[in-house]
Amino acid sequence: MPTLQCEFWNVGQGLFSSGRIQMGDAPAFHWVYDCGTNSSQKLIQNAIQEYNQQENNADIDLLVLSHFDRDHISGIKELLKNRRKIKHWVVPYYPLWQRLVIALLLDIQPDDEEWAFYQNPIQYFKTYFAEELKETKFLLLPAKKNESEISISLNPSSFDDVLSFETTEKLSNEFDNLEQLEPNVHWLNPDKALLFGKGEEQFEFVLYNVPFHLLAKVPTNLTAFQKQVKQIIQSHQSNSTDPTPALKTLYTLAFGNGSKHKNIISQYLYIRNITSTAVWGLGNNYIYDIPKNDGNEIIVFPKDRNKNAILYTGDAFLNDLPLLTDLTQSLGVERMARIYCLQVPHHGSKHNWQQGLANIFSPCLSVFSADSQRRNGHPHSEVLKDFATYTPILVNKNKRLFIHSI
């Protein structure tokens, strides 16, 4: 029987999670979701060193970064040391005009390092990791355009010895100049899951991006606004001038001053065995807190086999009904009912949460990756109280979590 295991590493105010699927004697499938911290960089370095030793420096089959704040990506360069390969790297895709809107709503300036990502995400990665990413397949994930459930019925237009996935038509020509990377750029169908498996055993990797109209308080006439943004970008591109001042003026008129209306992009990842039918040992978990040289390791042995999925949320906002509804409709009733482990959004911030959110997900395990000593004081008490009956576990500078065989 295949096993799915995962870790949440002790990196303080940040997130670094890894996992593997083992099927018999075949090489394990490895994934990583986020890799960064706003606490001491030494924490992420130590965590990656332990991860490397644990996995014998294995290549990563699937890398998913929720978004590009420092506390979620500061360890990527360390992770890719020693020529480690990334086989598939999922990149959230929004059209250029939307990316620049998002960047300025996040108060990212053209002289900030992150600005280059919003201009061209693949070129941004290539600049830093050219050698390591020569063979990487970049999977560009657009936001869904409808409210239907993400399907596992594939017409695999692309597959390899690791993953099967369905592609869609190219949505933009903006990456065509990356000639050496172009064969490895794939446009994912956002309505379909990625599948990994051998024989009858299948695991699904469901990816979800928030639609642009839910990311911010967008203008009523979005089509007219889009046209204005594109005109500004095109005119400045032809003159090789900086469009930022003109864009800022337009954004201020459309969105107002400040960023109180923004909801940052955060790519979700849902993982589970879709062929597992085992139902035994109803209940929650066996939990052991084991002292280690560099802190404590919390080891969880799941007991409830009705639930066998992990849901990563990154720093997602689920603080209003439209955001929550779009996510739950995309996952569907069956997937929602199978969530064993939920990574609670944004380190347990009350600003990303609404009352009763815990009951909607009803996980067996609620993971908060945070440093309560930081100025934000995550996780917030209101969120902890909401998740109190769903086995909340705080992963911080001193405690990491290992989930055994979901």
Residue ranges and their predicted role:
Residues 13, 68-73, 95-98, 317-320, ...:
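Active-site environment of divalent metal-dependent phosphoester hydrolases
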Residues 46-47, 75-79, 323-330, 353-360, ...:
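A short acidic, amphipathic alpha-helical/loop segment
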Residues 19, 345, 349-362, 367-406:
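C-terminal regions of proteins
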Residues 1-53, 285-319:
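Conserved beta-strand hairpin/beta-sheet module of binuclear metal-dependent hydrolase folds
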Residues 1-3, 13, 48, 53-57, ...:
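N-terminal helicase ATP-binding lobe
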Residues 2-4, 82-309, 389, 397-400, ...:
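Flexible, acidic/histidine-containing loops and adjacent segments that form or flank the divalent-metal
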Residues 321-324, 339:
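Active-site-proximal segments of catalytic enzyme domains
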